[in-house]
Structure formats: structure tokens, C-alpha cells
Amino acid sequence: MSNTTNPLPPETEQLLAKLNPIQLAWLSGYAWAKAQGEDAGTNVTNKNAASTLVTEDKPLNVTVLSASQTGNANGVANQLAERLKAEGVNVTRKALKEYKAKTIGDEQFVLLVTSTQGEGEAPEEGVPLYKLLHGKKAPNLANLEFAVLGLGDTSYPNFCQAGKDFDKRFEELGAKRLLARADADLDFKSTADKWIQDVVEAVKAKSAVSASVVASVVSASSAQSAVNYSKENPYTAKLITNQKITARDSAKDVRHFEFDLSGSGLQYKAGDALGVWAENDPDLINEVLGLLKIQPDESVQLNGKSLDIHGALLSRLELTQNTPAFVKGYAQLANNKKLTALVSSDKKLADYVNDTPIVDVLHDFPAKISAQQFADLLRPLTPRLYSISSSPEEVGEEVHLSVGVVRFEHEGRARTGVASGFLADRVEEDGEVKIFVEPNDNFRLPQDKSKPIIMIGSGTGIAPFRAFLQQRQAEEAEGKNWLIFGNQHFATDFLYQAEWQQFVKDGYLHKYDFAWSRDQAEKIYVQDKIREKSTALWQWLQEGAHVYVCGDASKMAKDVENALLEVIAREGKLTPEDAEEYLNDLREDKRYQRDVY
């Protein structure tokens, strides 16, 4: 056909050649309606997708949800959503912090990516949905199809428990499983990539036609001049301050660190976390290699690349956090009857892993294995995340951390945490550290600056609240601020004492309560202060206060939540069930937020 009789350009002809008969029929109707000046119905262009899927009856509506603590689950869910959009699927993408849990019963397809926090709990943003599904008012999900990917850490006993719980409960409530749940360890990329591919294929199989391009819109965006720093591409910052902020007699070593961000373009908000890529202690590496009788220059293969074992242990492999998988793998190579018996008992193995660093396994059960065998037993080294303790409104192009240095002894041998020890002991003044910002939209100050806030933290859990008050003061926020803080001793462990006193003088810390657990015979904790201040706390809640909790997930955060439920039930004259619902409503309204670890 010549161009004189065909008004379509060659590019359009090529595009049309790819369409199947059903899509051509639909496109014909669309074009006819346009020619008649009528509403053509479905919009075939999508700024965020390369295609729109057309079915004989109605398009698939897929909702991709994520429950993320550090951002990994969010990233995987974004990848899945983009893949589905590229295949023409109608996708709604939401993090659970912005999702109304009660609408779950209206969904057609739900694809959930969730991490796990604490002792197997759902991440903060996933709690409302978790509680709804496991509560008395759980919906009937007979019309739902679902798939779940869990992200976790095999070094913890409740590996991917949140994903397992969601997956099980969906099915119990009548939903149909689109495909089997997948569980991914810290090095989750390969598992996540396969799960995404399997999900895409399963969703495509559910559609009436194969995914194909109907129309595409390519929107050009201006290139960003600033480098996009991330976990995979960290910024190399200078450590400009390393100051111990606990007293000499304290049982704890807590450091205040400041990093220079000048010229980096790196941005963060109060409530975010900072990722730190640390290196393992060279002395620890030498101890390990000596025990295994391995030369530091012996070559090993990691992801298809060759490097010496010392370099691999320095910056590529996890050498401090023990796991059941490591001990089991080492037992097979060591051929030690006592160790073999130990790994045959799940409880004994879990207790041993919890109490024994990797290097001390080598002390307990000496064996001669190759450098490659040892490297194959270890997980990739991962960055450590710390709550940021500064506001850029106050400190400019700096970022501050408050870090408790992990120091302990095992069988008389001194051990140190990988990142805290790296920062405290091995990075010199103006030394370089690879860092990145991990946004935490689940821990944000209220947009309405007149709202009061209640900050509850213990130990280094005070870090984000220093950032919060710096931010509130910089913005001249009118809302009242109440700090409830706990630590061991007033004299040695009152972190940032002078700064809190200054906030009081400046009129930005209106109420404060402190729990010093070891300053009297009977231990007092922050949850005790919550109960003691029950009436005032309830009054603040009635005034619209936002409640923030930062600290240990396994004990402190649970005890604080139980205390809050007691206060709500007593002061609000509510049943335990109604108190639970009240607190869950606060959570959904972003008035109860936790940063726990």
C-alpha cells in the first residue's frame, strides 16, 4: 500500500503489526469513537507505563502492597509494579502506610512484599492490616487472589515470619493463592527477581489476552545534575566528630558521630535512618585466618570475581553475625561429633548461635577448611542502619548519629560490633565512611505544627527525638513537646543532657519524664512512667497528640505498647478490645509511629 492511500506513518504500521485481533478490534472502536467526538472510554496512554492491557471483558486490577522497615520491601514492590505495568496490567501501587486496611475485601488481586521486624512481627506500616486480618472483624476474602514475598534474615529464629503470617491468614480468610509464598534472606535479589518473574507470568496467564503494546508515551525528564546516592552507590563522607557522650563510669559506650555532607547534595529528613557500610576488624580477620590456617592472599571466587580472602573478609563478607546456616555448614566440613550433635537440636543450635560469634565457633571446634569453603559459608556483608539524630534545618550539610558501641567478651576474648566498632575505633578524624540515607516515611513529625507530640525512647532510642526537637525549633512549631526517656543512671547515661535543658529554656520541651532504671533498688522503665502519667497522657491524646516510640523491638517497644493500651483502656473507660482498636486507629492516622530495631 502506497503512502498516497495510507495516511499512517511507517512507525504506526510497525506498531499495528504487533497487535492481536482482539486488540485491533478494540483500537478500531476507540478510533471510531474519537472520530465521532465521543468519549472513547479507557485511556490508552499511560505516563507511567509502556502499555495498556486489553481484555475481552474487563482488565485485571492488581494492587501491589509493601510493608517495609528499611526500604527493601518497598523497592521490590516498586520493581514488581513497573514490570506489571510494562505488561499492560492495571496496577495500583501503595505502601501499607497509605493503604486503608478495611478496603482489602474489595480487591481482586493483592501482591504483598513484606519484611519482618523484632521477633517476627510485621513492620510498623503493616500492623493495621495485620491486626485487621487477625482480629474479630476480619473480612471475607473469597474474591481475592494473592501472592506474598517475605524478606527476612536467617540469623533470626522467626525468619520471614510476617510474610508467613500474612500468607497463611489470607488463605484462612478464603483468598486463593496465585502462587506459593517466597522467603528471601538478606541477599534477597535473586529470590525477589524470580518471584517477580513468576508473579508476572501468573498474572498474564489470568488475562484474556497476552500483554502487548497498544500505545506508549515516553516522557522526557531533565537529567539530574546531582548523583543519586543509595545503598548500592553510597556517598563517601568524612567523619568529622567522634565524641563519647556517656560518662567514664558508665557501663555503656555511646558515641555522637558527625559526618560532613558538603557538596554532596545528599538530603534527609528528621526521622530518616543513615546506612553505614563498615569494614570488618583486621585483627578479627587475622584471628579467623590463623585459626583456619589460611593465608591472607589465597584467592576466592565471589559472584564470579576473584579476590584474596583477606579483602573478601574485610569488606564483602559478614564476619560477626552468626547464623544457623553457618554453623550447620561448618559442622558438615569440620566432621566433629560434638558439633554434629549440637546442630541436630534446633533449640541447642539456636541458643549456641545467639551466644557465639563466628570466630568463637572456630575456637570451639577447630577444623582445616579451604579459603573458598569458608567464604561459601558466609553471607554478604550488609550495611547497618542508625536513626539520624539531627535535623538539616539545624546542622546544615551535616548528619549526626547516636550509636551505642557493641562491646562484650566471649570466653575472655573481647568482641566488638562491626559498624559501631568501625566508627568508634578504626575511622580516624576526617576519615572516610561510605553512607546513604534510608528514608523512613513511617516516622515523621505531624504536618500540622500546632499538634503536640509525645516522644518515648530508651538508650540510643533518644536519637530521632533530638532531630525532632531541632526541627520543631527551626520551624518555630507551636505544638507542645513531651519527652519520656529512660536509661540506666542519671549521672552517667543522660544523653545530650545540656541540649534538653536548653530546649526547656527555649520553650520547646514543655514536659519531660525520666526513668533511671539502676538508680534505686526497684528498676523503673519508661513504661512505668507512662502508667504514672496516665491522666496527662490521655489528655494529650484528646488534644490530638502524636505518639512516637524508638528503641528495642523485642522488649521495650512491646512493654510501651502494653502500657499505652492500659492507659487508653483505663482513662477512656474502654474494653481491652476497644483500646486495641483505638490504638490501631491512631496508627492508621499516623498518630502512633514506632522506629524500633
Swiss-Prot record:
Domain Flavodoxin-like: 62-200
EC number: 1.8.1.2
GO cellular component, one term: cytosol
Record text on cofactor binding: Binds 1 FAD per subunit. Binds 1 FMN per subunit.
GO molecular function, one term: flavin adenine dinucleotide binding
Keyword Transport: yes
Residues that coordinate or bind FAD: 320, 354, 384-387, 402-404, 417-420, 597
Pathway where this protein functions: Sulfur metabolism; hydrogen sulfide biosynthesis; hydrogen sulfide from sulfite (NADPH route): step 1/1
Cofactors that this protein relies on: FAD; FMN
Signal peptide positions (record): none
Pfam families xrefs: FAD_binding_1, Flavodoxin_1, NAD_binding_1
Catalytic activity: hydrogen sulfide + 3 NADP(+) + 3 H2O = sulfite + 3 NADPH + 4 H(+)
Top-level lineage group: Bacteria
Keywords: Amino-acid biosynthesis, Cysteine biosynthesis, Electron transport, FAD, Flavoprotein, FMN, NADP, Oxidoreductase, Transport
Catalytic EC class: oxidoreductase
Binding site for FMN: 68-73, 115-118, 151-160
Keyword Transferase in record: no
Record's subunit section: Alpha(8)-beta(8). The alpha component is a flavoprotein, the beta component is a hemoprotein.
Family from the record: Belongs to the NADPH-dependent sulphite reductase flavoprotein subunit CysJ family. In the N-terminal section; belongs to the flavodoxin family.
Protein name: Sulfite reductase [NADPH] flavoprotein alpha-component
Organism: Mannheimia succiniciproducens (strain KCTC 0769BP / MBEL55E)
Lineage: Bacteria, Pseudomonadati, Pseudomonadota, Gammaproteobacteria, Pasteurellales
The gene coding this protein: cysJ
